[in-house]
Design a protein with these regions (language model features):
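Beta-propeller-forming repeat regions
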Residues: 1-209
Length: 209
């Protein structure tokens, strides 16, 4: 018998009849405000990006209040479906965190900023496009990391449905390589310790590059 119990602390409904997957969720301090806790960033296949700042107060009867309208910092409709959301240092000459969003035909990097710079009711947040890259093939997934052991910067790698791996060094395109004996796209992960990419091919073999 476990001594621990799980209980609902905070819940939000993300739209109506929208679809999501695991890569559409990201957690971090997207507002870059040290006085704030981490935000929850959610993107949907309908192209809606939402940013939540969850807080919770306990009532006298021991229950939790849960979601309130001011917990949603941003709701933004994009032109394309959102396949993947990442948070990292994606802009050169800046140590701030930015939101990278993968769409079927492009990847874009955005800045989240509030008019007062504080998490308080009434603060207006906006999403600003920093840059974007058009992809040569429809995308499947992406990863980010300190490729090449670089410090204080995050680079992006996008896997296309044609087996391509396209690398971007922040605002600049770096290069494209193709996975050998490729048939279908699969999971992709970056291993910082070995500075390598790991994937699984269609023969169910784990490959490290």
């Amino acid at each position: 018998m476990s001594l621990f119990k799980a209980r609902d602390w905070w819940t939000a409904t993300c739209g109506t009849d929208e679809t999501f997957d695991a890569s559409c969720l990201c957690i971090g301090n997207a507002s870059n405000d040290p006085s704030q806790s981490d935000q929850i960033i959610v993107g949907s296949h309908s192209g809606v990006l939402r940013v939540y700042q969850p807080t919770c107060a306990q009532t006298e009867d021991g229950t939790f209040e849960g979601f309130r309208p001011e917990h949603m910092l941003l709701e933004f409709q994009m032109a394309q479906a959102i396949l993947h959301v990442l948070l990292g240092q994606f802009v050169s000459a800046s140590d701030k965190l930015f939101i990278a969003i993968l769409h079927p035909q492009r990847i874009s990097v955005h800045n989240l900023a509030g008019d007062a710079g504080e998490a308080e009711p009434g603060t207006q947040y906006k999403l600003s496009l920093m840059y974007e890259h058009t992809l040569s093939a429809p995308s499947y997934c992406c990863v980010a990391g300190h490729f090449g052991g670089v410090k204080g910067q995050d680079f992006l790698c996008v896997q296309g449905v044609d087996g391509s791996l396209t690398f971007f060094e922040q605002e600049n395109f770096a290069f494209t390589r193709y996975l050998p004996e490729f048939l279908l796209p699969g999971p992709l992960a970056y291993v910082a310790k070995t500075d390598s990419l790991v994937t699984v091919n269609t023969a169910f073999h784990l490959e490290n590059f």
